């Protein structure tokens, strides 16, 4: 903070340098971002709802996410707040159990009136249901006129995470980012919003959500290329989530080595594979946290229909999705052991338990190191840019100095030449003026009244006197005497 003003002044408020300084500050904070990416229809919103343990984000088959959601765990178990900007003015929506209130400069705006109406009409009495209704309206508000952006791209949400999950019990400060699907043809702002949001990410866990059947698609490969271009988002910690795995035709006894090799060689997977591939059923994982109490009837029906398959080992179609995970053997074996010991069988068998365990491990063991690496990377970038600017300014000053010295030497020569000319002119002028002055003095000031005859007489007297003084004979005689 002390050095920043100096650097910014030196760099003339360079946007790129300021952004990297922001990233340094962000990386030094204790926040652990979980950056969730994926093309629409992959079930990103449902997956994030499962991580949180409640249905707050709108979800469905259509591209529903048009904004970037930044979701943090609330300090109180019965309080939540949504913060965003509308027409560049901050709005906060507070939810406290069954109480809802708004904090805004203009509480009479059309948007707030619509939100108030929707929340009051909400037949879901719980806090999460009202949040879901409010977010759905905010998310869809600009679709009325896609050329007008009146709501900020980032929506900040603080909501209590379920204590039935690892993230909700963790002391680590996890913050989840939900980004728009990048392949939505119905919303032209998706790619732009995604790129703008990713530009500010740092020190996070990249989580790529896809489906087993579409993982080798061109859309996924294109999305991976975008992720790999994000500066300082370390792909070494990327988690690949095969969502809706319970709907996929997976081999009963797991993948053999040849199939694992084939999956790893898919273009998108080959680009992104690092910490592992996780097979997950977000609906079942969410149901394991909320005891099967869903707002969405389809989710409730799905969970109710499949519950026995995840809870009863004697069931003919008993599912353990974590056994399909593809990752280093040491990590895989550890997740196996922990999942088998987990008392919540549905949570473990849905694969979500293994995902959250890996996130907690990253935050507890590797985040501090990663923060140092990120700070080092960003500071190196700032130092490099600053050094480059210093070198440029030094070179400019040196060149300017040489130029000024050359100009001064030329000016000095011109000045000396001018002084010589001026001096000579002054001397000549003085000589001419002196002659003129003497002549004028002699002619006008000195007056001799002797006539010619008088002058001749004086001359004769002078010569006579001079002759007597110069007569050697007289002087010799006087000497002898």
Question: What is the meaning of each model-derived region?
Answer:
Residues 8, 14-15, 20-334, 342-366:
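Globular "head" domains of long coiled-coil molecular machines
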Residues 12-15, 120, 126, 325, ...:
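Short, flexible coil/linker elements and helix-boundary hinge sites characteristic
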Residues 43-44, 66-71, 189, 195, ...:
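A sequence-level detector of short, solvent-exposed, charge-rich linear segments
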Residues 244, 378, 461:
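Short acidic/histidine-centered micro-motifs embedded in hydrophobic/aromatic stretches
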Residues 330-350, 361-400:
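C-terminal helical "lid" subdomain and adjoining coupling/linker elements of P-loop NTPases
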Residues 384-481:
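A non-catalytic, extended alpha-helical scaffold characteristic of dynamin-superfamily P-loop GTPases
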């Amino acid at each position: 903070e002390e050095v920043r003003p100096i650097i910014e002044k030196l760099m003339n408020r360079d946007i790129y340098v300021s952004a990297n300084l922001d990233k340094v500050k962000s990386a030094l904070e204790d926040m652990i971002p979980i950056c969730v990416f994926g093309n629409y229809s992959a079930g990103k919103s449902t997956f994030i709802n499962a991580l949180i343990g409640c249905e707050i984000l709108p979800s469905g088959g259509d591209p529903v996410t048009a904004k970037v959601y930044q979701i943090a765990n609330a300090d109180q178990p019965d309080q939540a707040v949504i913060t965003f900007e509308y027409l560049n003015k901050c709005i906060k929506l507070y939810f406290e159990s069954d109480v809802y209130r708004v904090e805004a400069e203009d509480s009479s705006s059309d948007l707030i009136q619509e939100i108030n109406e929707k929340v009051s009409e909400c037949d879901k009495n719980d806090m999460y249901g009202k949040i879901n209704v409010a977010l759905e309206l905010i998310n869809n508000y600009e679709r009325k006129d896609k050329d007008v952006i009146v709501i900020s791209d980032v929506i900040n949400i603080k909501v209590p995470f379920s204590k039935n999950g690892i993230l909700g019990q963790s002391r680590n400060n996890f913050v989840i980012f939900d980004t728009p699907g990048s392949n939505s043809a119905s919303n032209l702002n998706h790619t732009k919003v995604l790129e703008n949001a990713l530009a500010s990410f740092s020190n996070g866990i990249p989580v790529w959500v896809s489906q087993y059947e579409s993982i080798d698609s061109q859309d996924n490969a294109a999305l991976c290329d975008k992720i790999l271009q994000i500066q300082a988002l370390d792909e070494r910690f990327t988690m690949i989530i095969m969502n809706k795995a319970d709907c996929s035709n997976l081999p009963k006894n797991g993948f053999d080595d040849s199939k694992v090799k084939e999956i790893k060689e898919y273009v998108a997977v080959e680009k992104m594979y690092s910490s592992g591939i996780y097979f997950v059923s977000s609906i079942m994982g969410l149901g394991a946290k909320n005891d099967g109490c869903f707002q969405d009837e389809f989710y409730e029906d799905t969970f109710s229909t499949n519950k026995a398959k995840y809870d009863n080992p004697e069931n003919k179609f008993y599912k353990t999705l974590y056994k399909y995970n593809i990752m280093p053997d040491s990590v895989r074996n550890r997740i196996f052991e922990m999942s088998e010991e987990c008392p919540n069988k549905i949570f473990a068998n849905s694969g979500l338990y293994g995902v959250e365990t890996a996130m907690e491990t990253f935050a507890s063991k590797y985040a501090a190191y990663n923060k140092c690496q990120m700070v080092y990377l960003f500071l190196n970038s700032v130092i490099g840019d600053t050094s480059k600017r210093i070198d440029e300014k030094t070179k400019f000053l040196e060149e300017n100095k040489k130029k000024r010295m050359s100009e001064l030497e030329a000016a000095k020569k011109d000045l000396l030449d001018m002084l010589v000319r001026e001096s000579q002119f002054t001397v000549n002028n003085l000589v001419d003026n002196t002659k003129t002055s003497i002549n004028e003095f002699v002619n006008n000031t000195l007056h001799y009244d002797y006539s010619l005859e008088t002058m001749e007489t004086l001359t004769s007297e002078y010569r006579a006197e001079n002759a007597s003084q110069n007569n050697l004979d007289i002087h010799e005689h006087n000497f002898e005497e």
